[in-house]
Amino acid sequence: MKKSSQPRNTKQRRHTIMQLLQEQGEVSVEQLVQLFDISEVTIRKDLSALETNGFLLRKYGGAILMPKEIIDENDELTKRKFVIAKAAAERIRDHNRIIVDSGSTTAALIKQLNLKQGLVVMTNSLSVATELRALENEPTLLMTGGTWDTRSESFQGKVAEQVLRSYDFDQLFIGADGIDLARGSTTFNELVGLSQVMAEVSREVVVMVESQKIGRKMPNLELTWQQIDVLITDTGLSEQDKQAILAHGVEVICV
């Protein structure tokens, strides 16, 4: 195939990469750079995005097709996280300054941000930061720094809190290990200080959580209902539990 015949559109280019993977089983960054006549940085972003969506596995210098045995198309929990993340992304406007806390549900939000322009994103998660770097719209990335906590796989501590307090944000997107209907969001992690500061410096606090966690009381209270503005969950939320949350003055979105 000639370079001039290759698609410049991101969607078309990634489709062509997948076609090549189907035919060859693997591709190299060098091969794709020559084929599309674009930068290595752009190709690496393409491969990262395709890996994030479960289509391939990156390796040194290229990528291979995702082995069928590790593809789980019926992962209902993953689907729930995706629809919750999509609903959360719809609340984000161009040029917003947002915080994305660590966690698998909040991490799913990053994939939805590619069409947003001029975003500033603060995170305490290396995995979230890595996914942000793969976005073509290249949002401004800020990191809290601090002490690495192996349990939550995120930065915590006083340094991280001080960094956060030097900024202000439009929105915080945060997950939860459980939702106590009487008190608020709960977590296994005893280190809740950073979550408190994240909420303090954000004008809107959005909790993203799957419905099976609602009613589940973890040992540590993370955010009270008074600190939460919006809760986004899936349609598995019962009407009784929804009314209990609404009674705290929290907006509830079921998707």
Which residues fall in each region the model found?
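HTH-adjacent hinge/linker in prokaryotic transcriptional regulators
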Residues: 2-30, 34-36, 40-99, 103-104, ...
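Residues at secondary-structure transition points
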Residues: 67-68, 109, 163, 181
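Conserved SAM-binding loop
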Residues: 99, 121, 187
